[in-house]
From Swiss-Prot:
UniProt KW keywords: ATP-binding, DNA damage, DNA repair, DNA-binding, Nucleotide-binding
UniProt cross-references to HAMAP family, sorted A to Z: MutS
Domain of life: Bacteria
TM regions (residue ranges): none
InterPro entries the record matches: DNA_mismatch_repair_MutS, DNA_mismatch_repair_MutS-lik_N, DNA_mismatch_repair_MutS/MSH, DNA_mismatch_repair_MutS_C, DNA_mismatch_repair_MutS_clamp, DNA_mismatch_repair_MutS_core, DNA_mismatch_repair_MutS_N, DNA_mismatch_repair_MutS_sf
Family membership noted in the UniProt record: Belongs to the DNA mismatch repair MutS family.
Xref: Pfam families: MutS_I, MutS_II, MutS_III, MutS_IV, MutS_V
SUPFAM superfamilies xref list: DNA repair protein MutS, domain I, DNA repair protein MutS, domain II, DNA repair protein MutS, domain III, P-loop containing nucleoside triphosphate hydrolases
Lineage: Bacteria, Pseudomonadati, Pseudomonadota, Gammaproteobacteria, Pasteurellales
Binding site for ATP: 613-620
Protein's name in the database: DNA mismatch repair protein MutS
Molecular function GO labels: ATP binding; ATP-dependent DNA damage sensor activity; damaged DNA binding; mismatched DNA binding
GO biological process: mismatch repair
Function: This protein is involved in the repair of mismatches in DNA. It is possible that it carries out the mismatch recognition step. This protein has a weak ATPase activity.
């Protein structure tokens, strides 16, 4: 494809410019009602999509290959291309054709790329890879997790199996170890990598001895874990399993940490799923909170951020320190200085684990060398700004002597494996240099010997060679073999040649082979000694990697706050959530139109909001954004709002949407009630609770009764900070009956038969549900909508009569409705009249003129 744009039409010149920006992917170029592809893209798409390949005039004197797909059907074509491993740039018209001079302005608005396939044999770069052991004793459940790629060793004790199930769902271990007599094995049904282990591996005394040996201690009191006896049993099992499988020392596993529920804002499995933190409801990673927040430049930073998202902390001092660092990095404009340096650090955490396991390859050591080289510049650009940042920088340390060691020891670009040799740099070891010089000198010696022997024997076909089986040899063609001197000893006969050895060559062969073998052996020895030289400072380097991970996360959050217009939230020790101009962090990134920001105000005197409004009005988005903003505040991030004050939170619960759990034999309603039961049992006055459409999976009476009772329990008993979305308008009378309850609604406007969703939150209850208008938007047949309107009018009339008769404060719509008095409503398909029946019975082709006339009179009579 030529790039001399002056030879092309203006439209094709525009296309070629856009294509040059996206050279390696297909470009869907919007032209009217079609997406067009040109040149090689057209040929490729035509073959992949089985669409026609045509030509579009000429440009630069040559016909232009072209293919196209209708814009309204583009998603199907995109899906096929993505499934074939192709990526597509979608180019839209953004200018106005009516006012454009020349081609309409266009730009690439999105790039559709295929999802990545996860190979179980490969380590997921930006996800933790954990082995976990679970244990239960006297009703106390525990889990111990070990990340072999970092040495991170955590234990937790939990009150029940539901809490353990939630923890497993958060961690998603690659392997789960459990005792042969584990009593709650049913919670493991949906996991892979299950390993039943003998009960003795979970014995407490065995575990304590094993852990003390690993850490080189006489007591575990220094780690603060000695009282978590059930968790220690699990820790002993997982450490035993690690040692059993690795069959080597594990020096990078040098501590153990007890995670307390009181330290974190707890999220159950349903909440993690509904909020789409790191995985969307379809199982992918697109359009999740992590997808928006995670622009970390190191894999280890990305993994740390995901841990923060799944385990927000309640330590306000630590949160404020994180905020201070984010604030400082923004104000001091250090983001663009630090991120390139951090990017060069790479995955130092996992490299160090491989060093500890002595499995690091030569290129791991060159990457470690590169990482260590960045540390002085990182420290220089991050220190002397705030006390919090200085404390973090202090953990990075100085490893200049180790960097110098690796600089001297390893060549710039080593081979993949040490066994290939050529890894240790020249000048690092004198003995190695001597052996290498001897090996390298073999070529010149053999050339000289070949010339000398050829001249001495007069055999012009004589040459010296080498193979792995016979070593060095002198080869002479069969035609001249009779000229071989007596001291030539035959070593091998070939079809066209004879191979010989002479004492001088044999002596040199032994010397060279010894040199090569000695060189490889010495190089391997020196390489292993490098691990010994690195190991004394392994713990310090691990601390540095942890600090660099945190700096990467905080620099990333500073960049996100700056790019996405986030603000610093404040914390209050009082109950409540006060957000002004709040936005959904994910939805605002995928919407083409501006996101409608909304407030929320909850406190001890106003702790339950009944949220009403139409379907598609934004109730679920509104509730999720409140939870996500609160969660973001509790990881130390800035938040998408004009301002936000978040009170003390201990848990976040969501009951949003539901589907059948066929694997467990549970219906949609059963899933819904199970989640609701968990909330009612576990929620406290400091919990944030989001309830969306409870009671839909059963009869109207049951559903309304359950919804009413749940709302009343949350308002009176737990007094949790609650948003309760519902289409049961009877619940809007709760504020008049219960303290701390208020109504809000998502606004909408109806004009004739259409509806406009305003997506703005207003005080008070919605006036109506707009269900019929939404049904019409969904394409429900007009006759069905008309019938529904008739039924609705009748039911509303009955409701009004019932209210007047019984003075029912709840305004029951259906309770006590006498449907037996329903007037006859025009059915969808009316019965045929006698006239229609007669007309339908006539076959004009079979009638004589007289019969046709008689039929006409008969029809006229029926009309009368």
């Amino acid at each position: 494809m030529t790039q001399d744009l002056s030879k092309h039409t203006p439209m094709m010149a525009q296309y070629l410019q856009l294509k040059a920006q996206n050279p390696d992917i297909l470009l869907f170029y919007r032209m009217g009602d079609f997406y067009e592809l040109f040149y090689d893209d057209a040929k490729k798409a035509a073959a992949l999509l089985d669409i026609s390949l045509t030509k579009r005039g000429a440009s630069a004197g040559e016909p232009i290959p072209m293919a196209g797909v209708p814009y309204h059907a583009v998603e199907g074509y995109l899906a096929k291309l993505v499934s074939l491993g192709e990526s597509v740039a979608i180019c839209e018209q953004i200018g106005d054709p009516a006012t454009s001079k020349g081609p309409v302005e266009r730009k690439v608005v999105r790039i559709v790329t295929p999802g990545t396939v996860s190979d179980e044999a490969l380590l997921p770069e930006r996800q933790d890879n954990l082995v976990a052991a679970i244990y239960e004793e006297k009703g106390v459940f525990a889990i111990a997790t070990l990340d072999m790629t970092s040495g991170r060793f955590l234990i937790t004790e939990l009150p029940n199996k539901e809490a353990l199930a939630a923890e497993l769902q958060r961690l998603l271990p690659a392997e789960i170890l459990y005792a042969e007599d584990f009593s709650a094995a049913e919670i493991l049904n949906n996991y892979k990598g299950l390993r039943r282990r003998p009960v003795w591996e979970f014995e407490l005394v065995t575990a304590i001895n094993l852990l003390n040996r690993q850490f080189g201690t006489q007591s575990l009191a220094g780690f603060g874990v000695e009282k978590a006896v059930v968790a220690l049993c699990a820790a002993g099992c997982v450490l035993h399993y690690a040692q059993e499988t690795q069959r080597t020392a594990l020096p990078h596993i040098n501590s153990i940490h007890l995670a307390q529920n009181s330290d974190t804002v707890l999220l159950d499995a349903a909440t993690r799923r509904n909020l789409e933190l790191t995985q969307n409801l379809a199982g992918g990673t697109e359009n999740t909170l992590a997808a928006v927040l995670d622009k970390c430049v190191t894999p280890m930073g990305s993994r740390l951020l995901k841990r923060w998202i799944h385990q927000p902390i309640r330590d306000l001092e630590k949160l404020k320190k994180r905020q201070d660092i984010i604030d400082t990095l923004q104000k001091e404009q250090r983001i663009e200085l630090l991120q390139p340096l951090l990017q060069n650090v790479g995955d130092m955490e996992r490299i160090l684990a491989r060093v500890a396991l002595r499995s690091a390859r030569p290129r791991d050591l060159t990457r470690l060398r590169t990482a260590l080289a960045q540390l002085p510049d990182i420290a220089k650009n991050a220190k002397n700004l705030t006390a919090s940042l200085d404390a973090l920088v202090a953990q990075i340390g100085d490893f200049s002597e180790l960097h110098a060691l690796l600089e001297r020891a390893i060549i710039e670009t080593p081979p993949q494996l040490i066994r290939d040799g050529g890894v240790i740099a020249e000048g690092y070891n004198a003995e190695l240099d001597e052996w290498r010089e001897l090996s390298a000198g073999a070529t010149q010696y053999l050339e000289n010997l070949e010339i000398r022997e050829r001249e001495a024997t007069g055999i012009d076909t004589l040459k010296i060679g080498f193979n792995a089986v016979h070593g060095y040899y002198i080869q002479i063609s069969q035609g001249q073999a009779h000229k071989a001197p007596m001291h030539y000893v035959r070593r091998q006969t070939l079809k066209n040649a004879e191979r010989y050895i002479i004492p001088e060559l044999k002596t040199y062969e032994d010397k060279v082979l010894k040199a090569k073998g000695a060189s490889l052996a010495l190089e391997k020895q020196l390489y292993d000694e490098l691990f010994d030289l690195l190991m004394p400072r392994l713990g310090e380097m691990q601390l540095a990697a942890m600090a660099l991970s945190e700096l990467d996360v905080l620099t990333n959050l500073a960049e996100r706050a700056e790019s996405l217009n986030y603000v610093r939230p404040t914390f209050s020790l009082q109950r409540g959530v006060n957000i002004k101009g709040g936005r959904h962090p994910v939805v605002e990134q995928v919407l083409k139109d501006p996101f409608i920001a909304n407030p929320v105000f909850l406190n001890a005197q106003r702790h339950l909001l009944v949220v009403t409004g139409p379907n598609m009005g934004g109730k679920s988005t509104y509730m999720r954004q409140i939870a996500l903003i609160s969660l973001m505040a509790y990881i130390g991030s800035f938040v998408p709002a004009d301002s936000a004050e978040i009170g003390a939170l201990d848990r976040i619960f969501t009951r949003i949407g539901a589907s059948d759990d066929l694997a467990s034999g549970r219906s949609t309603f059963m899933v819904e009630m199970t989640e609701m039961a968990n909330i009612l049992h576990q929620a406290t006055e400091n919990s944030l609770v989001l309830i969306d459409e409870i009671g839909r999976g059963t009869s109207t009476y049951d559903g309304l009764s359950l919804a009413w009772a749940c709302a009343e329990w949350l308002a009176k008993k737990t007094q949790s900070l609650t948003l309760f979305a519902t289409h049961y308008f009877e619940l809007t009378s709760l504020p008049s009956q219960l303290k701390g309850v208020a109504n809000v609604h998502l606004d909408a406007r109806e004009h004739q038969d259409s509806i406009v969703f305003m997506h703005s939150v207003q005080e008070g209850a919605a006036s109506k549900s707009y269900g019929l208008a939404v049904a019409a938007l969904a394409g429900v047949p007009k006759q069905v909508i008309q019938l529904a309107k008739q039924r609705l009018a009748h039911l509303e009339e009955i409701s009004l009569q019932t209210k007047e008769a019984h003075d029912n404060p709840q305004g029951d719509l259906l309770f006590a409705a006498d449907l037996q008095e329903t007037p006859q409503i025009q059915p969808l398909v009316a019965q045929q009249s006698e006239l229609e029946k007669a007309l339908m019975s006539i076959d004009p082709d079979e009638l004589t003129p007289r019969q046709a006339l008689e039929a006409l009179y008969r029809l006229k009579k029926l009309m009368a």
